[in-house]
Amino acid sequence: MYAVIQSGGKQHRVVEGETLKVELLKAESGATITFDDVLMVVNGDNIQIGAPVVAGAKVTAEVIGHGRHDKIRIIKMRRRKHYRKQQGHRQWFTELKITGISG
């Protein structure tokens, strides 16, 4: 059984017991979160596709912790003009463990 949820403007395919990183959520470590934006639920041959969400479907997850991804470098350069600009960015994330899929 798996589901597709929407979080932080992205869609994630989740399975019970899986850990995944989503955009930063305002929740304490150890807290339980419920996702109501379930776009699809697949249980064997039974497939439920929402329009836009599946009614009554929920995915619960436990917050493991928060962190930051690896740094990415943004480089701007104008050739022959001796202009170079560097910037770095580290995006915050929340790590979740999926505890249940219902619906």
Curated annotation (Swiss-Prot):
The molecular function GO annotations come to: rRNA binding; structural constituent of ribosome
Q: Does the keyword Signal apply?
A: no
Question: Quick one: a GO biological-process term for this protein?
Answer: translation
Please give an example of a GO cellular component term from this record. Answer: ribonucleoprotein complex
Q: Which InterPro entries match?
A: bL21-like (IPR028909), bL21-like_sf (IPR036164), Ribosomal_bL21 (IPR001787), Ribosomal_bL21_CS (IPR018258)
The UniProt keywords, alphabetically, are:
Ribonucleoprotein, Ribosomal protein, RNA-binding, rRNA-binding
Which region is the signal sequence? none
The UniProt similarity line reads: Belongs to the bacterial ribosomal protein bL21 family.
Question: What is known about what this protein does?
Answer: This protein binds to 23S rRNA in the presence of protein L20.
Subunit architecture: Part of the 50S ribosomal subunit. Contacts protein L20.
Q: Which HAMAP family match?
A: Ribosomal_bL21
The protein, known as: Large ribosomal subunit protein bL21
Which gene is the coding source of this polypeptide chain?
Answer: rplU
